[in-house]
């Protein structure tokens, strides 16, 4: 089994209050918590976000610039469409297994204030390993030569 000693999450600094109060939540949970009506919420979860979105709660949801539909579509397997992939990813919280990947993401945030959250990987996986998923690729990037992705891209940590 893959051992992850330290895990990292890069959060928008404006979201720290929400994270302290509610924990790290997926985009799907953040939209529900913000009181976005279900029909609008479902549409938002399946739509590409070319820009960041600020919710009525003040929480900032990151853009999905590295996953434009035209670049993503040819990389999808299992009959998935770009809206299916966006919805799938919007149901998860993502952590990086190494600092280098985190720093690449930070550079992509183009100067917006960020906060680095550092987790004890062994403890986190002990407590949440049953629902943790791992991916062999950066599932949120479809630029350049995108890796194939499908229903088995996010794999159960226990089976990794």
Language model: regions and residue ranges:
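Gly/serine-rich nucleotide phosphate-binding loop at the start of the catalytic core
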Residues: 1-48
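Conserved NAD+-utilizing ADP-ribose enzyme module
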Residues: 1-3, 38-72, 77-93, 97-160
């Amino acid at each position: 089994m893959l051992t992850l000693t330290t895990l990292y999450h890069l959060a928008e600094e404006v979201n720290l209050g929400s994270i302290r109060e509610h924990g790290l939540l997926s985009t799907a949970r953040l939209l529900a918590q913000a009181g976005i009506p279900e029909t609008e919420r479902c549409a938002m979860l399946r739509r590409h976000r070319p820009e960041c979105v600020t919710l009525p709660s003040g929480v900032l949801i990151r853009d999905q610039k590295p996953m434009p539909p035209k670049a993503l579509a040819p990389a999808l397997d299992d009959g998935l469409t770009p809206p299916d992939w966006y919805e799938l990813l919007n149901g998860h919280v993502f952590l990086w297994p190494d600092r280098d990947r985190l720093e690449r993401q930070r550079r992509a945030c183009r100067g917006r204030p960020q906060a680095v959250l550092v987790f004890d990987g062994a403890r986190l996986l002990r407590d949440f390993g049953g629902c943790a998923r791992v991916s062999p690729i950066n599932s949120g990037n479809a630029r350049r030569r995108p890796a194939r992705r499908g229903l088995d891209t996010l794999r159960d940590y226990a089976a990794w």
